[in-house]
Amino acid sequence: MRWKMKARVLSNRRIASEVYEMTFEWKGKKPHPGQFLMIDCQGKTFLKRPFSVNDFEEEKMTILYQVRGEGTKNLSQMKEGDILEITGPHGNGFEILEGKRVLIVGGGVGIAPLLYLAKKVKAQKLYIALGFKRETFLVEKFEGLGEVVVTTEEGSTGRKGLVTSVVEEMIGEVDIVYGCGPKPMLKALQEISMKANVLCQISLEEKMACGIGACLGCACKVREDKGFSYKRVCRDGPVFWAEEVLF
C-alpha cells in the first residue's frame, strides 16, 4: 500500500483516566483536518485501528486515544523510540469554509480531530464548545484559538450539563458547525442545525478493519432522494454534511 510507513514514537503520555496523547515522527503526506490514520497496535491483534489526526506540525503527528480494548492497551504501553506501522492519512476531512462564524463542538475523546481543525480554520469568529462527563483534557490547547466553553455533566468543571445546550444557545450566531463525538451528540447537532438552517459537518466514529473501503465494515446509512443508501465512513467520510446521515 502506497501510504504504508514506519514512525518513531516521540512521546506517549496519559492526560486523563484511560486517555492518552501520543506524538510520533511523520515524514508522510501532510494531513487535512478530519483525516485519520490506521495504526498497527501490535500484540495479538492483527487489524489496524483508526485514529484521528489530533495535531500536526514540523514532521510531528499527534493522536488522542482512549484505552478500550487490547489494541489501545498495547498502544498505551509503547515508549519513546518504539516503532509504529501506519497507513494514511485516510478519508476526506472537513470542508473548511473561510470567513465564516464557526462553532466547533466536541464530546469526550471525540475532540480528537478538532484541535487540528481549530488551528487551520480561517474564521471571522471562532467558538469552541467542549463537553465531558466529568474529567476534562486538552482544554488548554484550544484556549487562545477561539472563545472556549467547557461543559461537564456533573458540573465539576465549567458549565453543568450537555455540550449541546451551548449549541442551542449559540446556533443563531454562527454560519457553520463542525462536530465530533458520541452519536447522540451528533444526532442533536444534526437536529439543531437543520432546524436553524445552519450548515453542519460531523465526523463519524466507526470501527474499521481496512480503512480503504474494501471490507464495508464501517458503512453508515445516508439519505437519498428516493429513500436511503449506504456510504463507507473510511472512504466517503469520516466527515459528512449532517443532513446526509440517518442515525
UniProtKB/Swiss-Prot annotation:
Cofactor names: [2Fe-2S] cluster; FAD
UniProt keyword Cytoplasm present: no
Pathway field: Pyrimidine metabolism; UMP biosynthesis via de novo pathway; orotate from (S)-dihydroorotate (NAD(+) route): step 1/1
MF terms (GO), sorted A to Z: 2 iron, 2 sulfur cluster binding; electron transfer activity; flavin adenine dinucleotide binding; metal ion binding; oxidoreductase activity
Organism: Caldanaerobacter subterraneus subsp. tengcongensis (strain DSM 15242 / JCM 11007 / NBRC 100824 / MB4) (Thermoanaerobacter tengcongensis)
Entries under Pfam families matching the protein: DHODB_Fe-S_bind (PF10418)
Gene3D superfamilies recorded: Dihydroorotate dehydrogenase, electron transfer subunit (2.10.240.10), Nucleotide-binding domain of ferredoxin-NADP reductase (FNR) module (3.40.50.80), Translation factors (2.40.30.10)
UniProt xrefs under HAMAP family: DHODB_Fe_S_bind
Keyword entries, A-Z: 2Fe-2S, Electron transport, FAD, Flavoprotein, Iron, Iron-sulfur, Metal-binding, Pyrimidine biosynthesis, Transport
Leader sequence segment: none
Single GO biological process annotation from the record: 'de novo' UMP biosynthetic process
Subunit-structure text: Heterotetramer of 2 PyrK and 2 PyrD type B subunits.
Protein name: Dihydroorotate dehydrogenase B (NAD(+)), electron transfer subunit
InterPro entries (UniProt xref): Cyt_c3_hydrogenase_gsu, Dihydroorotate_DH_ele_sf, Dihydroorotate_DH_Fe-S-bd, Dihydroorotate_DHASE_ETsu, FAD-bd_FR_type, FNR_nucleotide-bd, PyrK_electron_transfer, Riboflavin_synthase-like_b-brl
Binding positions ([2Fe-2S] cluster): C210, C215, C218, C234
Domain FAD-binding FR-type: 2-96
Binding site for FAD: R49, P50, F51, S52, L64, Y65, Q66, G71, T72
Similarity annotation: Belongs to the PyrK family.
